[in-house]
Amino acid sequence: MKKRLYISIPITGMEEKSRIKAAQLQKHFEAQGYEVINPFEIGFHLEKLHDLCGHKPPTWANYMEWCVWALRSCDIIFFCVGWACSKGCTVEMEESIKFKKEIIYE
């Protein structure tokens, strides 16, 4: 059974750069045999759901709820450089510790 790996990456203020990096990391880890959870894919589905339901665009808190939910289903959390300066990544770190996830750093 493949291990699930979540990518924790700073996003706010550098969305496009982070999207590209997350996609590269996803390919890298998938080539190593991991099932990878990319937060940008979570965001894409959340945005589509809000649109289909006629809701306002998702808030930062909505994104974090979904990301934390996905993180909890993973075995390993990969923290990218800069995570400690990111509000979202620090929330993900707290959850990783709380749920005793294996943590690796870039």
Task: Name each region found by the language model.
Residues 1-106:
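Conserved catalytic or regulatory cores that recognize and/or transform ribose-phosphate-containing ligands
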